[in-house]
Amino acid sequence: MNQHQATPGTLPSDEASRHFTPLIQPDLAGLYSRRAARLRALAEGHDLADYLRLAARVAEVQASLVAEADVSGPADARAIPQEGHWGALLDRLIERLAHDVPAPVAPHLAALRALPADARLGAAQALTEGRFDAVPAAIAPFLWAALSLQCASAARAAPVPDSGPAEHASCPVCGTAPVASLILIGDRQGMRYLHCALCESQWHMVRAKCTNCGEASELDYLSFDTAEATVRAESCGVCHGYLKVISLERDPPAEAVADDLASLALDDAVTAEGYQRTGFNPFALPG
């Protein structure tokens, strides 16, 4: 694994003074479709090819369900389970996946379909409260996919929150941790945005400082490739946390959830160095 320290050049010289949008909410159907395409591309020759393709299929179904989501509910993570709208999305998700998943996955979808309403609610509450180990790993990603679609849809229908000048370690819309941070291209060339694991919002944070504690004095960037790798782990020697940085400058088709999921081996290596991940992936929930 390669390691290099942050330098002043890592931070674009004009980022602090440039006009920028503090919060971005990408079009959901387009986002899910791009994610699915990226997952399928990354699956080629990958050790986790079957799982990456399953995640791609889930993203495709999410894209097909965007128009069916109820946008009237709250976008707060802990309020979503009680609203109940996500349950109908879960049923449709299971129905559309049932005949198009690997054989070992089918029994888990059937068990999830048969789960009583109170058990579903309890599992959803556990996930949105961060008690991931309370939900079987075989069904958690499907539950999360429905919860995420509902929360993301509600977030796009609600007024954009005024998060103030402070930069946030967690999503200013729903309060959930990020999947990773993205270095963007185009009008926001070189700017960093964190991508929410639940509502799919993206919020700005300047580069070359820890996304968890805000310190800039002890940052290292770890990767299996060179310092110019598309996916690197930004690790902090102050709080001992880390979060991946995914550069669209280096690979424009890169996508937060897809590229993070395809680089879980990097998580294992960074964790072995004594760092703790400060975010999570919807298809690889902690616990």
From Swiss-Prot:
Location in or out of the cell: Cytoplasm
Q: Which GO terms describe its biological process?
A: protein maturation
Keywords of the record, alphabetical order, are: Cytoplasm
Q: Which GO terms describe its molecular function?
A: ferric iron binding
CC terms in the record's Gene Ontology section = cytosol
What the entry lists under InterPro entries is as follows: FdhE-like_sf (IPR024064), FdhE_C (IPR056796), FdhE_central (IPR056797), FdhE_N (IPR056774), Formate_DH_accessory (IPR006452)
Entry similarity comment: Belongs to the FdhE family.
Q: What does this protein do?
A: Necessary for formate dehydrogenase activity.
Name under which the protein is recorded: Protein FdhE homolog
Q: Which organism is it from?
A: Cupriavidus necator (strain ATCC 17699 / DSM 428 / KCTC 22496 / NCIMB 10442 / H16 / Stanier 337) (Ralstonia eutropha)
